[in-house]
């Protein structure tokens, strides 16, 4: 029987605690000179922005009535690492599917960009708890190509484990233990079933624990209605916050835009469409517009009502990536001969992406710097996130989209 690669791509964003900071704003937060402007960062951010939106639109095409949550960074990292061992059309499809222009960007620069991104995300000195991990699980009688192994370790910080896939329960435990440890127990059963021909598995995770500089006050949280659609309403715990916030209305998107900063180097962008404008928002949203929001912040007195929620996403990447042009790797025409020294052809038989996000009131106070700002004497806007909305969480040094999601029903986990 022809061996095949079974690849489980696994992601976690665990205990994502949104803590708004309207009293602890630092002038440097709007100073773009503080951002990492290296070519590697710029390159990866540009491509990941395009990739994230393309992937999101494909998910909407598959189902526009459910919550969406995924990590463009996690998915792109795993496929980019796999490209190290691919050749021919398989290789080209992967990198072009990740939105890289191979006539303008060398393969070496692509992998250096990912290396720089992972080093930035895994900085131990950051206030933001953000870590990633890549695990290569190799059948004990399979020998990997040394060049692939060295580059996977060097560029993608990959850990290598020798396992016996003939003992599927034992192999699952090794993979699941790796992910469970890396995600601090948030994903305990990442792999439920392995294909019988599996000889190689790749697991990627990302753990994100974000706290706002100033938390919501739980005493202000009250039960309120959330309108899933025109005929469906659910009850949710609705958090409330008032103060000087980065909020404005974007006529291009027909949506309200809210930016909220984490302690550390991450920002969440929330997009609340006007009535009946969700489809317009999804069709019009672009990485250029998001970049403008991040660079040109507008603070004003405002009040927001935001649902406490916990959502997750689990996706079959074969059906998700194929419309983006990544098809060869999943069929018998795949060329992954740069991974193993064996002559038997390999293909990607399984590709799974999992993500979890929690938003609640908890968080930590930052050293407060009181900022007084004159504002026009007009009625402050009241934003009620009581109908479906989008959000994107960015790492600020690289301007890379870590997570992208859509909340349709905050009660559906």
From Swiss-Prot:
<feature type="glycosylation site" description="N-linked (GlcNAc...) asparagine">
    <location>
        <position position="64"/>
    </location>
</feature>
<dbReference type="InterPro" id="IPR042185">
    <property type="entry name" value="Serpin_sf_2"/>
</dbReference>
<keyword id="KW-0722">Serine protease inhibitor</keyword>
<feature type="glycosylation site" description="N-linked (GlcNAc...) asparagine">
    <location>
        <position position="101"/>
    </location>
</feature>
<keyword id="KW-0011">Acute phase</keyword>
<dbReference type="GO" id="GO:0005615">
    <property type="term" value="C:extracellular space"/>
</dbReference>
<dbReference type="GO" id="GO:0005576">
    <property type="term" value="C:extracellular region"/>
</dbReference>
<dbReference type="GO" id="GO:0034097">
    <property type="term" value="P:response to cytokine"/>
</dbReference>
<keyword id="KW-0646">Protease inhibitor</keyword>
<feature type="site" description="Reactive bond">
    <location>
        <begin position="377"/>
        <end position="378"/>
    </location>
</feature>
<dbReference type="GO" id="GO:0043434">
    <property type="term" value="P:response to peptide hormone"/>
</dbReference>
<dbReference type="InterPro" id="IPR023795">
    <property type="entry name" value="Serpin_CS"/>
</dbReference>
<dbReference type="GO" id="GO:0006487">
    <property type="term" value="P:protein N-linked glycosylation"/>
</dbReference>
<comment type="function">
    <text>Inhibitor of serine proteases. Its primary target is elastase, but it also has a moderate affinity for plasmin and thrombin.</text>
</comment>
<dbReference type="Pfam" id="PF00079">
    <property type="entry name" value="Serpin"/>
</dbReference>
<keyword id="KW-0732">Signal</keyword>
<dbReference type="GO" id="GO:0004867">
    <property type="term" value="F:serine-type endopeptidase inhibitor activity"/>
</dbReference>
<feature type="signal peptide">
    <location>
        <begin position="1"/>
        <end position="24"/>
    </location>
</feature>
<dbReference type="InterPro" id="IPR023796">
    <property type="entry name" value="Serpin_dom"/>
</dbReference>
<feature type="glycosylation site" description="N-linked (GlcNAc...) asparagine">
    <location>
        <position position="265"/>
    </location>
</feature>
<feature type="region of interest" description="RCL">
    <location>
        <begin position="368"/>
        <end position="387"/>
    </location>
</feature>
<keyword id="KW-0964">Secreted</keyword>
<dbReference type="GO" id="GO:0006953">
    <property type="term" value="P:acute-phase response"/>
</dbReference>
<dbReference type="InterPro" id="IPR036186">
    <property type="entry name" value="Serpin_sf"/>
</dbReference>
<dbReference type="InterPro" id="IPR000215">
    <property type="entry name" value="Serpin_fam"/>
</dbReference>
<dbReference type="InterPro" id="IPR042178">
    <property type="entry name" value="Serpin_sf_1"/>
</dbReference>
<keyword id="KW-0325">Glycoprotein</keyword>
<comment type="similarity">
    <text>Belongs to the serpin family.</text>
</comment>
<dbReference type="GO" id="GO:0062023">
    <property type="term" value="C:collagen-containing extracellular matrix"/>
</dbReference>
<protein>
    <recommendedName>
        <fullName>Alpha-1-antitrypsin 1-1</fullName>
    </recommendedName>
</protein>
